[in-house]
């Protein structure tokens, strides 16, 4: 098998790394418009729950299948969505995390304050409830874990905001999608100010479809309540949801908890568990997933192993997760019509792997798109000793979508790309794409 990767194309250029927030010019997402054009959404605000969902994105559009790009109005979001078997298009936007005033937050009952008779229930007066559990992360933020059903009525709804473009239409209509998830929990984080809740949105990108035409998407929990018994788990778990009604309802249909093992992985107790998850259905009917296990909030570094697991019973159970590579955030899996499945991921560096194995077990070696070595010498003003973000020179949050039976388009960021306008000699934060072709 031969994998050909094209030269990069510039989608969007923002400020220089030195003049921007972490989170700015990151998280490129590729999605189709109802008229067939390709669009890329880029986050251009801080990487914060308070900033998501505030229309702080840049949208660019391509009408030649990704060969060239131009900026477009943010209203294009109403014309985009992932195609469903029914012909509808569906899109889940990230929403803004709810802010709760510090004075309204009840302190967690811990140690001797906790009694055998205590029950965490909904407050009759509509006030904020007691958390089920509280812990502090490496930055000393207080993380409160709540049973969703105990929150005030306006926040206790098991539903996600979606935009649906009905088959034959060109404009999206907002829709509340029902969620079926036992013991569903939500996390609030409080530092020096008010408490901010995790955005109540699914975190997966796009959908996958099984042989029966059911719609699947992925998400993850953060610290959470076990859906089987309500037990507290401070490690994040991967979630798989399935819809059998054209995306109007999603039911929890796969749960992959994180089980630390320092014998195999020295950072096991510091990496915060499984988060971003990629899913693909293989030709033999099995499901494979790639699992991010990188997080700094319990003390781990900005990089960590990425894991692979496989299910042969429709997501009810998964094999024990095994290391897929030494790094991997926001992993992508994509099965092309030619029968080859691609994986894309990174941090540090950006890599593409491929397999023609119908079981998804045997993979080719990684192909390097961006080096995982120190890139800080490319900065406008290189430091003597870089921090990790300067070292990587990219958020390494990639997206991968099909554009042909044997071709995909990869979107990623490069923080040190020369200004293409000719107005400055600076290196700028840039969103790039490359074509990946299976020959």
Regions found by a protein language model. Name each.
Residues 1-439:
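Asp-box/BNR beta-propeller blade signature and adjacent active/binding-site loops
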């Amino acid at each position: 098998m031969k994998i050909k990767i094209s030269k990069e194309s510039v989608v969007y250029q923002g400020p220089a790394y030195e003049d921007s927030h972490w989170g700015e010019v990151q998280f490129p997402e590729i999605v189709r418009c109802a008229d067939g054009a390709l669009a890329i959404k880029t986050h251009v605000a801080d990487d914060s729950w308070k900033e998501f969902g505030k229309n702080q994105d840049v949208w660019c559009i391509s009408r030649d299948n990704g060969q060239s790009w131009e900026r477009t109005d943010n209203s294009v979001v109403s014309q985009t969505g992932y195609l469903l078997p029914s012909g509808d298009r569906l899109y889940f936007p990230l929403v803004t995390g709810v802010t709760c005033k510090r004075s309204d937050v009840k302190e967690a009952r811990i140690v001797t304050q906790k009694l055998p008779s205590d029950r965490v229930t909904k407050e009759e007066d509509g006030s904020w409830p007691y958390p089920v559990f509280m812990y502090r992360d490496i930055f000393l933020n207080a993380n409160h874990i709540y049973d969703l059903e105990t929150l005030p009525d306006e926040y206790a709804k098991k539903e996600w905001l979606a935009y649906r473009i009905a088959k034959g239409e060109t404009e999206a209509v907002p829709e509340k999608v029902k969620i079926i998830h036992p013991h569903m929990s939500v996390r609030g984080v409080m530092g020096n100010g008010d408490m901010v809740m995790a955005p109540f949105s699914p975190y997966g990108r796009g959908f996958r479809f099984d042989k029966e035409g059911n719609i699947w998407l992925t998400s993850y929990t953060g610290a959470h309540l076990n859906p089987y018994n309500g037990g507290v788990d401070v490690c994040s778990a991967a979630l798989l949801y399935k819809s059998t009604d054209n995306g109007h309802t999603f039911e929890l249909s796969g749960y992959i908890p994180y089980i630390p093992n320092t014998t195999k992985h020295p950072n096991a107790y510091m990496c915060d568990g499984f988060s971003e998850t990629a899913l693909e259905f293989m030709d033999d009917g099995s499901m494979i997933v790639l699992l991010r296990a990188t997080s700094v909030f319990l003390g781990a570094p900005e990089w960590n192993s990425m894991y692979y697991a496989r299910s042969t019973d429709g997501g009810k159970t998964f094999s024990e997760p095994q290391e897929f590579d030494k790094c991997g955030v926001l992993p992508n899996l994509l099965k092309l019509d030619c029968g080859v499945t691609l994986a894309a991921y990174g941090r540090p560096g950006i890599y593409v792997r491929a397999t023609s194995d119908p079981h998804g077990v045997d993979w080719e070696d990684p192909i390097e798109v961006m080096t995982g070595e120190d890139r800080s010498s490319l900065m406008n003003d290189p430091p003597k000793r870089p921090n990790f973000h300067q070292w990587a020179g990219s958020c390494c949050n990639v997206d991968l979508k099909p554009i042909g039976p044997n071709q995909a388009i990869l979107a990623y960021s490069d923080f040190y790309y020369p200004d293409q306008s000719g107005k400055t000699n600076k290196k700028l934060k840039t969103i790039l794409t490359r074509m990946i072709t299976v020959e």
